[in-house]
Design a protein with these regions (language model features):
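Non-catalytic alpha-helical scaffolds and adjoining flexible linkers that form interface surfaces
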Residues: 1-21, 25-210
């Protein structure tokens, strides 16, 4: 049996002298591993992947045709390269193997396309991907109070215990016990600044470490 589609290389574990067990993320087949022989790929490569196996439960083998090397575009920027590696590792660790996740794939590709852009834009897309992944593994934000939000009293805080989002007025009395919600998480046109990005990283990091 076999399947073929575009995929993102997330990890390559050397096996023997000329092989590797390569993990990719594809739109239809999700996180998927296979044996790659006598060929080298790099984490962050977009490939045309052909997976072949005798039975569905087997590891199978890859034939990978590189279409785009995202790492090549950031090789001279160590920080961006590290962020690319971090993105791929995050996907590998949080997703369940062989589970379709076309929405995650689309969001991941959108994130990687932004990696060569302005630093604030890349950071925003990365945080949105983290938040999206958290929702997929059961740690999504509870926004039932969104109907209570107004221009003067926006959604502003997140409970670290339940993930529930509350408005500024409801959360203010407990602000020292709550996580802050950056505006761009609920308003895509919100202005980005260092403070809002720091709030975003503090929020997603808390739940990813749980």
């Amino acid at each position: 049996m076999q399947w073929q589609e575009d995929a993102l290389v997330l990890h390559a574990a050397p096996l023997g002298e000329s092989g590797a067990v390569v993990t990719v993320l594809s739109e239809t087949h999700g996180l998927h591993r296979g044996l790659l022989k006598r060929q080298k790929v790099t984490v962050g490569d977009l490939v045309r992947a052909l997976w072949t196996a005798r039975l569905p439960e087997h590891l199978g083998t890859w034939a990978l045709d590189v279409k785009k090397k995202y790492s090549a575009s950031v090789l001279r920027d160590p920080l961006r390269l590290q962020e690319l590696m971090l993105t791929c590792e995050l996907l590998r660790r949080l997703l369940t193997e062989r589970t379709p996740c076309n929405d995650v794939y689309d969001q991941a590709m959108h994130c990687l396309e932004a990696i060569r852009g302005p630093a604030f834009t890349w950071a925003k897309e990365y945080l949105i991907l983290e938040l999206f992944l958290l929702s997929k593994v059961g740690f999504g934000l509870d926004v039932r109070d969104a109907v209570l939000a107004t221009e003067d009293d926006p959604l502003r805080y997140v409970s670290p215990r339940t993930g529930r989002v509350v408005t500024q007025s409801r959360g203010q009395p407990y602000h020292d016990k709550l996580l802050r919600l950056p505006e761009f998480f609920v308003n895509s046109s919100a202005e980005l600044d260092t403070d809002s990005l720091q709030e975003g990283f503090a929020l997603t990091e808390f739940f990813i470490q749980l």
